[in-house]
């Protein structure tokens, strides 16, 4: 099978199903994540809460940091590029990262176009708030989708909103008659062939993870029960008071997301979760989830 095809790339992402992907900024953190059972790590210079606090322009991480993290773990390593910054993506692909996240957490480089991901052999993950956004990214070649949530807040409300929106729209498409599909594709500005495929199969053609605001094992289990295939945890692990224990607990929560007794047990004695932000108190211009289109 030819490498770099959409089938191969989306197939690779399927292997992460049921897993937790953790943001890490040092080799030491990467080891903690791997030992806790993370299925992959996201190599960053700063976690989203620090990016949010610092303001200014957030760019791709220094390649040195990414290389150092790649050397110490055997699980897949992801890295972020800015929306539309295909040269950052080219650099990351040349370094041999396993996945690229075209991420709204970084400052967008292009306000009109996302990266054309079909040009790359490496699989991409992209964020979405609704089904239209998800299908537009898949149409551009994204091999994996995640909710945008509101990164760096420790507040799960936006991730819940985005997951409910996507899953509700998937159910709506399934119930439509074939003659409604073309008009609906136009309404949500999505490729018609993907809407037709969704109607036929009843599911997205790629894995759909939860991200943005996951701060506790209960948050992770909530997103799984809402239909997520797995969970990204950004600031929630290493901004908590006991990162190693929190990391292990979140991994267990994703595995046992339907068992309330296990969830209660693993939630004990974890110390303080990361400090949280009320979304309503954030200036609308500073909402990360609004980036992208």
Curated annotation (Swiss-Prot):
Binding site for D-ribose 5-phosphate: 23, 152, 213, 234-235
Reactions this protein catalyses: aldehydo-D-ribose 5-phosphate + D-glyceraldehyde 3-phosphate + L-glutamine = pyridoxal 5'-phosphate + L-glutamate + phosphate + 3 H2O + H(+)
GO biological process: amino acid metabolic process; pyridoxal phosphate biosynthetic process; pyridoxine biosynthetic process
Gene Ontology MF terms: pyridoxal 5'-phosphate synthase (glutamine hydrolysing) activity
Residues annotated as binding D-glyceraldehyde 3-phosphate: 164
Pfam families linked: SOR_SNZ
Its EC number(s): 4.3.3.6
Coiled-coil positions: none
Record carries keyword Lyase: yes
Family designation: Belongs to the PdxS/SNZ family.
Role, per record: Catalyzes the formation of pyridoxal 5'-phosphate from ribose 5-phosphate (RBP), glyceraldehyde 3-phosphate (G3P) and ammonia. The ammonia is provided by the PdxT subunit. Can also use ribulose 5-phosphate and dihydroxyacetone phosphate as substrates, resulting from enzyme-catalyzed isomerization of RBP and G3P, respectively.
NCBIfam families listed in its UniProt record: PRK04180.1, pyridoxal 5'-phosphate synthase lyase subunit PdxS
Protein name: Pyridoxal 5'-phosphate synthase subunit PdxS
Species: Dehalococcoides mccartyi (strain ATCC BAA-2100 / JCM 16839 / KCTC 5957 / BAV1)
Lineage: Bacteria, Bacillati, Chloroflexota, Dehalococcoidia, Dehalococcoidales
């Amino acid at each position: 099978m030819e490498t770099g095809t959409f089938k191969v790339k989306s197939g690779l992402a399927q292997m992460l199903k049921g897993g937790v992907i953790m943001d890490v900024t040092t080799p030491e953190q990467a080891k903690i994540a791997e030992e806790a059972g993370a299925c992959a790590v996201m190599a960053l210079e700063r976690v989203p809460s620090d990016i949010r606090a610092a303001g200014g322009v957030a760019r791709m991480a220094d390649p040195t940091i990414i290389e150092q993290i790649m050397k110490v773990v055997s699980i897949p390593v992801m890295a972020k590029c800015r929306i539309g910054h295909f040269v950052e993506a080219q650099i990351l692909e040349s370094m041999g990262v396993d996945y690229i996240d075209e991420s709204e957490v970084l400052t967008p480089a292009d306000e009109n176009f996302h990266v054309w991901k079909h040009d790359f052999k490496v699989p991409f993950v992209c964020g979405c708030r609704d089904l239209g956004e998800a299908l537009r990214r898949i149409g551009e070649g994204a091999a994996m989708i995640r909710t945008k949530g509101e990164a760096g807040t420790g507040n799960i409300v936006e991730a819940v909103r985005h997951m409910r929106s996507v899953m509700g729209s998937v159910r709506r498409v399934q119930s439509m008659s074939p003659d409604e599909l073309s008009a609906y594709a136009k309404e949500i500005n999505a490729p018609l062939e993907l809407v037709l495929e969704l109607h036929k199969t009843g599911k997205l053609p790629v894995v759909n993870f939860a991200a943005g605001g996951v701060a506790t094992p209960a948050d992770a289990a909530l997103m799984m029960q809402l239909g997520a295939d797995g969970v990204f945890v950004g600031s929630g692990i290493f901004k908590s008071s006991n990162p190693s224990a929190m990391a292990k607990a979140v991994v267990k929560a994703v595995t046992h997301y339907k068992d309330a007794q296990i969830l209660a047990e693993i939630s004990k004695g974890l110390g303080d979760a990361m400090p949280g932000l009320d979304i309503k108190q954030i200036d609308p211009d500073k909402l990360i989830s609004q980036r992208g289109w």
